[in-house]
Curated annotation (Swiss-Prot):
It is found in: Cell membrane. This is NADH-quinone oxidoreductase subunit D 2. NDH-1 is composed of 14 different subunits. Subunits NuoB, C, D, E, F, and G constitute the peripheral sector of the complex. Belongs to the complex I 49 kDa subunit family. Its main location: membrane. It comes from the Bacteria. It is a peripheral membrane protein. PANTHER family: NADH DEHYDROGENASE [UBIQUINONE] IRON-SULFUR PROTEIN 2, MITOCHONDRIAL (PTHR11993:SF10), NADH-UBIQUINONE OXIDOREDUCTASE 49 KDA SUBUNIT (PTHR11993). It catalyses: a quinone + NADH + 5 H(+)(in) = a quinol + NAD(+) + 4 H(+)(out). NDH-1 shuttles electrons from NADH, via FMN and iron-sulfur (Fe-S) centers, to quinones in the respiratory chain. The immediate electron acceptor for the enzyme in this species is believed to be ubiquinone. Couples the redox reaction to proton translocation (for every two electrons transferred, four hydrogen ions are translocated across the cytoplasmic membrane), and thus conserves the redox energy in a proton gradient. GO terms for molecular function: NAD binding; NADH:ubiquinone reductase (non-electrogenic) activity; quinone binding. It comes from Herpetosiphon aurantiacus (strain ATCC 23779 / DSM 785 / 114-95). Keywords: Cell membrane, Membrane, NAD, Quinone, Translocase, Transport, Ubiquinone. Its EC number is 7.1.1.-.
């Protein structure tokens, strides 16, 4: 009788498929994966401890460095937590501006994430280059309003640092004219791709029950058939004024997570259309002038605020002792939580599938390790 022996191998911490310094200790029997242990910590930067030393405002640019693809969303979530804690009101126009930036970030994130995932599958780079083309247009707009392409540091307590003007609105409308063609081309090229179907269908299945048990969120949860989106379940900013759907999958495999992200880009487009149409004039201002940004002190208490980031639920938990810094500062990072389900997604599949499954979760190590 033929006997096989299990073998332990390391993938990472420096490996092109891990998209950052992340190590997987993998146990295989032949080419079949038996066990997987994720090893974190290579990018630890003491983020939460620094958040308890910095003033509230000083901590804003540090949030840019969590999910560095989505600094606008990070800023929004942190600003909401401080505003909740300090009882700060946000002008209506600023709420709309934040939503516009968040939805542009969602399109940017999903376009590049799916491009990278197809590269991991051994497909081609065309999809990634298409995504990068749209990403460049969005980053140019971010640079115009914030002065930076990626580390935007754009939100302030009670609003945003700079208003959007006619040029921005014109460029946004130009971008949106081309987005439907990009979505159609992307879908038409890829959904019938033999490489995508072979490498994604019935691979990395995460059943609904396991998804809920692991508390995963975002496209990973919705890909498993759970129609949960914070923008619908607990509307913040002005999301309750927009009509949009929550796309879900049926199987919970890599392919479903791919489809959910494509559908979410279309829903973000719908939200942007409505936001432009409803955007209030500049009369109410883009920031609350009563807020003392540099010397802000929150009354003693605690607050938790969350947003639907492109990767899932991004939350900030703050405890105040009445001083100008947080007594306790905690980040609920979706990449970290979603990554906890990786082992169950991978068991029983080929070691070659691990790279694809990891890519379908869409992690950024900046918010995994912190």
């Amino acid at each position: 009788m033929l006997k096989t022996e299990e073998l332990q191998i390391n993938i990472g911490p420096q490996h092109p498929s891990t998209h950052g310094v992340f190590r997987m200790l993998v146990t295989v029997d032949g080419e079949t994966l038996v066990d997987l242990k994720p090893v974190f910590g290579y990018l630890h930067r003491n983020h939460e401890q620094l958040g308890e030393v910095n003033t509230y405002l000083q901590n804003m640019p540090f949030t840019d460095r969590l999910d560095y693809f989505n600094s606008m969303v990070n800023n929004h979530a942190y600003a909401r937590a401080v505003e909740t804690l300090a009882g700060v009101e946000v002008p209506e126009r600023a709420q709309y501006i934040r939503v516009i930036m968040d939805e542009l970030s969602r399109i940017l994130n999903h376009a590049t994430a799916m491009g990278f995932m197809l590269g991991d599958m051994g497909a081609w780079q065309t999809a990634l280059l298409w995504g990068m083309r749209e990403r460049e247009k969005i980053l140019d707009m971010f640079e115009y309003v914030s002065g930076a392409r990626m580390m935007c540091n754009y939100c302030r307590f009670g609003g945003v640092v700079r208003d959007i003007d006619d040029w921005f609105i014109t460029e946004l409308k130009k971008l949106m004219q081309g987005l439907p063609h990009y979505f159609d081309d992307f879908e038409g090229l890829l959904l019938n791709s033999e490489i995508l179907l072979a490498r994604a269908r019935n691979i990395g299945v995460l059943p609904k029950e396991l998804a809920l048990a692991y508390s995963v969120t975002g496209p990973v949860l919705r890909g498993s058939g759970v129609a949960y989106d914070i923008r619908k379940a607990e509307p913040y900013a002005v999301y309750d004024r927009f009509k949009f759907k929550v796309p879900v999958g049926t199987v919970g495999d890599v392919y479903d997570r791919f489809l959910v992200r494509i559908a979410e880009m279309r829903e973000s487009y719908k939200i942007l259309e409505q936001a432009i149409e409803q955007l209030p004039d500049a009369t109410g201002g883009f920031i609350n002038p009563k807020v003392k940004q540099q010397s802000l002190k929150a009354p003693a208490g605690e607050a938790y605020a969350r947003v639907e980031s492109p990767k899932g639920e991004l939350g900030f938990y703050l405890v105040s002792d009445g001083s100008g810094s947080a007594y306790r500062y905690k980040v609920r990072a979706p990449s970290f939580i979603n990554l906890s389900s990786l082992a169950d997604m991978c068991k029983g599949y080929s070691i070659a599938d691990v790279v694809v499954i990891l890519g379908s979760i869409d992690i950024v190590m900046g918010e995994v390790d912190r």
